[in-house]
């Protein structure tokens, strides 16, 4: 896509996806607070929330190790023996840290009957090459199988091919230039593959959205609207359905407006009859790792739905589960 990849600075891994740097932070005090909260009769849930909902991925890593070294115990096992339900799910998601939780979710999504397609979308789509490689490596270390192998076994036909494009981790890096001629070419290809012909060339659309950088996708969406006075999002909704439609929309929104993408995913987990707690818990925890992004998501949510995200979450959840999610949204 323009200049050869060799000259382009790769996007660095997200916090928690690269080699763990030594941080000047001592987890001993928090480890002791956690042990005290769970030792003996009863559990001090407020302390669990206060300590765990406020840590970044590197601190969580240190804290998990400190707990293990100091008490010779496994923090996840202790938490599981003390609490239950979605509160437990949320705490464990935090303790694992973002990368191990991604791998845990992928394994869980593909090992039971039926595939949780939403989980595959949430974990794998719109990721940087560096994060995708980290996920694939850790998945292999954990399960002794390749992620490609398991995805192949769980998806069918064109959706499988779409996800194999995603897993190839050969997106343009974010520092790659956005070249107008290439954008125009992609726009025409997308038009010809969808509205411009009878029948849709699904894989061409998948290919473009799986290989371009966020900045390039943003430019493609902008140019498409200028040229054809229609949103690419509308076109995808009209031309696709099911899992592939959802996947392509998620890739498109990653480029056009990441905060709005996540605001819509959160609303999707709460809208309609019954809250999809599995999705809600993991989406809130995933978003909470990056505080700046979290604030943008809260702003986007308010802008779109005219109410605060935490207010909405409070209406859908209760008890310690509610308090944990609200704390993850930065309101402790």
What label would you give each PLM region?
Residues 1-332:
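Structural signature for extended repeat/solenoid scaffolds and their inter-repeat hinge/linker regions
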